Regions:
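Conserved Ser/Thr-centered positions that define the repeating blades of beta-propeller domains
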Residues: 61, 183, 242-243, 291-297
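Structural motif
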Residues: 56-57, 109-110, 173-177, 234-240, ...
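Beta-rich accessory regions
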Residues: 22-67, 87-89, 94-107, 126, ...
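Surface loop/turn signatures of beta-propeller and other carbohydrate-active proteins
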Residues: 23-35, 66-86, 109-151, 170-173, ...
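Acidic, glycine-rich loop-and-beta core segments that form the ion-binding/anion-interacting portion
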Residues: 325-329, 335, 343-361
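Bacterial Sec-dependent N-terminal signal peptides
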Residues: 1-23
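Beta-propeller domains
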Residues: 55-64, 141, 157-158, 162-194
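Hydrophobic core segments of beta-strands in well-ordered, beta-rich domains
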Residues: 47, 98-101, 149-169, 191-195, ...
């Protein structure tokens, strides 16, 4: 029936491939935008976006069938930015057209008058030159479009692979796809495209990837195998595999491989468990985690669940991770379960909590009492934390989404939205009878420093503060905007006040003072400043705090009250 309808639609508009591209208006909300064969030879069709416009639902038709579908806020009366629809996706196809339904109350003449029709244009290039004052220099960001959770992190052959929740057709959440970037140093990243795109099973939500060294899946030795959530009416788990180091993926013909009617059933994270010689997977299901095992990554056995009555339950549990690590200064090894939660964070919105205990491949047992909640980062803007598979030397390298669901869609950027945290190496330490997660900047951040240190604050730098007792650190600019950080040695707390940091009117939830326990004294703070973010970490790993800031001008002044001394390194 769909094929007959599309054929009739094309015939109604008098469409042939020889016509120049044009819009034919079929009803108050319906248009067919035809693309000539000549135009298909160009690189991309630039779609004009207006962020406060109604959503348009676009189906790409070729050879009398639907080959792609996505949503975009086509410009109504002005253009905020353009996004590309790349023509190479449709190479060799004929009869290409966009079947467009624009939501909203339009008469036929009103639809015809929208700005988008005259602004759509073909181009042999898409300009990715940065136009944003707040885009960071040494944090990963998408060149354009929206990004949230990091996904499918793995290391192979000297390359760090970062996939991420991505909207290629706008800078707000929509059209969930896996974007892909690579790096050789965890600091400088190169965008590699969108290797896992939505399909008939659903849009592509969060998941993980592993290097299958022993070919347990049958996809080939050292194949990269990804599990992700297919989001449709229900959320199910699907698989894709790569035999070219993660550049391209083939979706498994047996998808979905795990189904459920449970809402919020998502974000599979898998890893090889040497203790049981099997794969384990941890999966978020509402407000608890489910644990599975497998011999081949395709067939999964339910083992147990964890989380009822443990930790914070102020929101949905998401983006889990589970890993074994040594406890600093002891001969102990413990397992840590990461559980991202939204809402329910210590200062509102989203945050990363974790649990420490034992895991035998079948069941996770938490060491702490159920009412104990531990946070990995005490800022407002650190979420969806996950680690890289196959990291060298047994390291547990983590990256997070650097934003908060309370305002992520409204922050004052348009070309792109959201970045990732700096990479951090995780570990464990003991303090007063509890075991906590240690978080330190990855050594790659030290390697990125300039050779010489100075006192001048720049908009993208690392500030190292050596402390001897209480200290107050203030970053400010000529506009009077400032961020105040305070360390109280006696109380064992560190706080950051961004209530006068700059632009805040985009959300009532942005202004905040965040406060963290330090689990003992801090002798050195490492503060990473990168245009629109401040990450403060104890050099020994006992405290981490991440907050976004949007000063109208860069902070160019620093004062340290107390006995602390500081140095500033540029990050290259």
């Amino acid at each position: 029936m769909k094929k007959i309808f599309i054929s009739a639609l094309v015939a109604l508009c008098g469409f042939t491939a020889s016509y120049a591209q044009q819009a034919s208006f079929l009803s108050n909300n319906h248009c067919l935008y035809r693309i000539s064969q000549e135009s298909q030879n160009q690189k991309c069709l630039l779609l004009p976006v207006q962020e406060n416009a109604e959503m348009a639902n676009i189906k790409v038709i070729a050879d009398n069938k639907q080959v792609k579908a996505f949503n975009v806020k086509l410009a109504k009366d002005h253009v905020d930015y353009f996004v590309p629809l790349y023509m190479d996706e449709f190479a060799g196809l004929k009869g290409l057209a966009l079947d467009i339904h624009v939501n909203g109350d339009y008469n036929k003449e009103g639809l015809n008058a929208l700005t988008c029709w005259k602004e759509m244009k073909f181009s042999d290039a898409f300009d990715m030159k940065n136009r944003e004052q707040y885009r960071p220099d040494f944090h990963h960001t998408p060149a354009y479009g929206w990004m949230n959770d990091p996904n499918g992190l793995f290391y192979k052959d000297g390359v760090w692979n970062l996939y991420f929740q991505y909207n290629p057709y706008g800078s707000q959440w929509e059209n969930m796809t896996w974007g892909h970037s690579t790096s050789t140093d965890l600091v400088h990243w190169k965008f590699q495209g969108t290797p896992i795109q939505p399909d008939a099973v659903g849009t592509i939500f969060s998941g993980s990837a592993v290097v299958d060294k022993n070919n347990t899946s049958g996809f080939g030795k050292d194949a990269v195998v990804a599990l992700y959530t297919s989001a449709a009416e229900n959320q199910t788990q699907s698989m894709a595999y790569s035999t070219d180091n993660g550049k391209t993926f083939t979706k498994y013909e047996g998808n979905p491989i795990i189904t459920s009617t449970v809402p919020d059933f998502r974000d599979p994270h898998m890893f090889w468990n040497e203790g049981i010689k099997k794969w384990n997977m941890i999966l978020a299901a509402g407000q608890h985690m489910e644990i599975y095992s497998s011999d081949n990554l395709k067939d999964w056995k339910y083992e147990s669940s964890f989380g009822e009555k443990y930790g914070n339950h102020g929101g949905v549990w998401e983006c889990p991770d589970l890993m074994k690590m040594k406890v600093r200064g002891t001969d102990k090894e413990k397992w840590m379960l990461i559980c991202n939660i939204n809402p329910g964070g210590p200062f509102g919105g989203s945050a990363t909590q974790y649990f420490v205990g034992d895991f035998d491949g079948h069941k996770f047992t938490c060491d702490s009492k159920p009412e104990v909640t531990k946070w990995m980062d005490y800022g407002k803007d650190h979420y969806a934390t996950v680690t890289f598979d196959n990291a060298p030397e047994g390291r547990r390298v983590a990256i997070a989404w650097m934003s908060n669901w309370q305002y992520a869609n409204q922050v004052p950027t348009q070309q792109y939205r959201s970045g990732n945290s700096i990479p951090r190496d995780l570990g464990l330490f003991e303090y007063k009878g509890e075991t906590y997660c240690s978080v330190v900047p990855s050594p790659e951040m030290t390697a990125a420093r300039s050779k010489k240190a100075g006192k001048k604050l720049t908009e993208s730098c690392e500030m190292v503060v050596n402390l001897k007792g209480n200290a107050t650190i203030t970053l400010s600019n000529d506009k009077g905007e400032k961020v105040v950080m305070n360390y109280d040695a006696k109380a064992e707390t560190f706080s950051m006040d961004r209530t006068k940091s700059g632009k805040m009117d985009f959300s009532k939830d942005f202004a905040a003072v965040t406060k963290a326990p330090t689990y003992g004294n801090i002798s050195q703070l490492r503060i990473f400043i990168d245009k629109s973010s401040i990450e403060a970490l104890d050099a020994d790993g006992k405290m981490a705090m991440t907050n976004l800031v949007f000063p109208s001008k860069p902070y160019n002044k620093v004062t340290v009250k107390g006995k602390g001394k500081y140095q500033v390194y540029d990050i290259k």
